[in-house]
Regions:
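Conserved AMP-binding/adenylation subdomain of ANL enzymes
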Residues: 238-257, 265-306, 320
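Adenylate-forming
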Residues: 134-144, 162-164, 262, 290, ...
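A short helix-loop-beta submotif of the ANL/AMP-binding
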Residues: 82-83, 89-109, 113-117, 125-131, ...
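Flexible, low-complexity linker/hinge segments
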Residues: 22-31, 144, 173-214
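Conserved AMP-binding/adenylate-forming core of the ANL superfamily
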Residues: 27-29, 38, 46-91, 95-99, ...
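Conserved adenylate-forming
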Residues: 73-78, 82, 200-213, 217-260, ...
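Structural core segment of the AMP-binding/adenylate-forming
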Residues: 76, 103-195
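Flexible, non-catalytic linker and terminal segments flanking ANL/adenylate-forming cores
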Residues: 1-30
């Protein structure tokens, strides 16, 4: 492999360290981020895109819902460049609104679902958020409602948790999970998901320059101070997904299945779970929260090909007493990010 850039003739000595199968020289033509979803939906419409708590969503379904979200947002007044906040755990609505809002021309702002009211209020003000999206659950909606009167937010779109569950869980959820259900207020600032997407999905296309149009404000972790919103263009996010596709070449196929237990509101999981999976046409198996036993059972039962984690996750798996009782042989590769992975953990995980 040449160590010269294919486009600029600039020396790139790091290419000599790339594995032979990794293409580090062919230029990537940037597209709007939502092309990751739309391109695959055109090629493999019937393939599973999302598996959430055993309910499966095809690429055609996720695209159709994202188109309806885009039109619905435009109908309630969202203009290109306006900020829309996602206050959601890992779930189908995250994927739908992420791409639907971008189609409508929005700039996304990811919110940590664990944020307390002061943190939510601060980020809304700092990012100048106009619209928010959340679930009708007690851990989320009441916190957002508490800051709504003090914020600039025009509308809160409330998504029903029960609707994304498989039968019969979707029917019994309101009764069995009454303690975690939150009722949506009936007023002009709250919009039910069913009302937002009650349209034909024919949204007005928005002109996007991938190199200059900001796709999202990704807030930093705040470990060294107050979290700051980093501007990521459509090109930044799209190209990063295609770069991941080139590096994870051993599972570059529509048969890829990725475990999505890391939160999608973080840049790492956003890229390596959601956008990479869309780029290869695979299926993301989304979990709203991490639990060691649940994750082991999930890998054993669902047979994923990829596991995206952080050092603490891999350490928790290895230290689980019944770790060896579960079959993880379907995994073609595992990737760790967020912090350096100790060599001993990597070696032990590969050996086990």
């Amino acid at each position: 492999m040449s160590d010269m850039s294919a486009t600029h003739g600039v020396a790139q000595p790091w290419l000599a360290s790339y594995p032979p199968a990794v293409d580090g020289t062919t230029p990537i033509v940037a597209k709007p981020v939502y092309a990751l979803l739309d391109d695959t939906a055109a090629q493999h419409p019937g393939n599973d895109c999302v598996d959430f708590l055993d309910k499966h969503y095809s690429y055609a379904e996720i695209k159709r819902e994202s188109d309806k979200v885009a039109k619905g947002l435009q109908q309630i007044g969202l203009k290109p460049g306006m900020r829309l906040g996602l206050f959601l755990p890992n779930c189908p609505y995250f994927v739908i609104f992420y791409h639907g809002a971008l189609k409508a021309g929005a700039c996304l702002v990811n919110f940590n679902p664990l944020y307390a009211e002061p943190e939510i209020e601060r980020q809304i003000a700092d990012a100048e958020v106009d619209f928010m999206v959340t679930l009708d659950v007690s851990q989320l909606l009441p916190k957002l409602d508490a800051v709504l009167t003090k914020s600039r937010v025009k509308s809160v779109i409330v998504c029903p948790m029960a609707q994304q569950l498989p039968f019969p869980k979707n029917l019994v959820y309101p009764f069995v999970m009454r303690s975690v259900h939150a009722r949506m207020r009936i007023d002009s600032r709250h919009i039910a998901y069913k009302d937002l997407v009650h349209n034909d999905g024919a949204y007005a296309p928005v002109e996007i320059d991938p190199a200059t149009t900001v796709a999202l404000l990704q807030y930093t972790g705040g470990t060294t101070g107050v979290p700051k919103g980093a501007m990521l263009s459509h090109a930044n996010v799209y190209i990063n997904a295609i770069q991941s596709k080139r590096w994870f070449y051993t599972v570059d196929s529509p048969q890829a299945k990725t475990i999505g237990v890391l939160p999608l509101f973080h840049a790492f999981a956003m890229t390596c779970v959601m956008n990479w999976t869309l780029a290869v046409g695979g299926c993301m198996i989304l979990e709203p929260k991490f639990d060691t036993l649940k994750l082991l059972r999930l890998v054993h039962r669902k047979r994923p090909t990829a596991l995206v984690g952080v050092p603490t996750l891999f350490n928790a798996l290895l230290n689980f007493p019944q770790f060896k009782d579960y079959d993880l042989s379907s995994l073609v590769f595992a990737i760790s990010g967020g912090a350096p992975l100790p060599v001993e953990i990597r070696k032990k995980f590969e050996e086990e």
